[in-house]
Structure formats: C-alpha cells, structure tokens
UniProtKB/Swiss-Prot annotation:
GO CC, any one term: cytosolic large ribosomal subunit
The name this protein goes by in its record: Large ribosomal subunit protein uL14
NCBIfam families assigned to the protein according to its UniProt record, in alphabetical order: rplN_bact
RNA-binding is among the record's keywords: yes
Source organism (scientific name): Natranaerobius thermophilus (strain ATCC BAA-1301 / DSM 18059 / JW/NM-WN-LF)
One GO process term, biological-process aspect: translation
Family: Belongs to the universal ribosomal protein uL14 family.
Matches recorded under InterPro entries: Ribosomal_uL14, Ribosomal_uL14_bac-type, Ribosomal_uL14_CS, Ribosomal_uL14_sf
Subunit structure: Part of the 50S ribosomal subunit. Forms a cluster with proteins L3 and L19. In the 70S ribosome, L14 and L19 interact and together make contacts with the 16S rRNA in bridges B5 and B8.
Any Pfam family matching the protein: Ribosomal_L14
Classification via PROSITE patterns: RIBOSOMAL_L14 (PS00049)
Length: 122
C-alpha cells in the first residue's frame, strides 16, 4: 500500500532512482495505491544526465509493493521493495528499459508496453 509521503524505487532507466508520493490518482478520497495504480510524485534522487531531474513532478505507475496482492486462486505475491515506472500523459513509459519483475495485474490495467519491456512477468 502506497500513500502520501511513501518513497519508491524507480524501476526504469529514466535517470530517477527514488520518488516520493505526493498524491494517489484515482476515484474520490482514495488513500492507498496498489499495483497498477497511478501516483503523482516528486523525484528525490536522480542520476546526472538522465531524462528527468531531481525535484521534478512526474506521474508513475506502481509495479511492485512490499504488501503484495492476493490473486483469485488464493495465492499472494509480494516483493522486497516498493517500485514504480515513470509514465507520460498517454500512460506509456518514459524510459526504454524496465528493471526487475512486474506482476500480471498490469495486463488487466492495460499497461502492455510496460509488460513487453519487463524482463519477467509474475
């Protein structure tokens, strides 16, 4: 579960390393974001020469959470870190590579470009 002030690792090659959540994009008074949800965040740590800079406000989709997700068959999938991928207005990733695994739930949310770039889909 990601909420305001949560920090996430960035799982792409845009140059950002860490994002802090400012707002969860969604319906009404939604407080928490899970895998596949879009957040607005500010870049807290970035590498020099990247596409994005420190302090820039960006949108990102969550691809991994520590809390995990319950699947319809009753199994859970959880990760060691909270991670996201920076996206543009058309919900396409701004980077050209994705690092680490992503979940199948992104397919249901129509993030096919992220699924195709990911090295592993769990």
């Amino acid at each position: 579960m990601i909420q305001t002030e949560s920090t996430l690792r960035v799982a792409d090659n845009t140059g950002a390393r860490e994002i802090q959540c400012i707002k969860v994009i969604g319906a009404g008074q939604k407080q928490y974001a899970n895998v596949g949800d879009v957040i607005v965040g500010t870049i807290k740590e970035a590498t020099p020469g990247g596409v994005v800079k420190r302090g820039q406000v960006v949108r990102a989709v969550i691809v991994r959470t520590k809390r995990g997700i319950k699947r319809p068959d009753g199994s859970y999938i959880r990760f060691d870190e909270n991670a996201c991928v920076i996206i543009d207005e058309n919900k396409d990733p701004r980077g050209t590579r994705i690092f680490g695994p992503v979940t199948r739930e992104l397919r249901e949310k129509k993030y096919m470009k992220i699924i195709s770039l990911a090295p592993e889909v769990l």
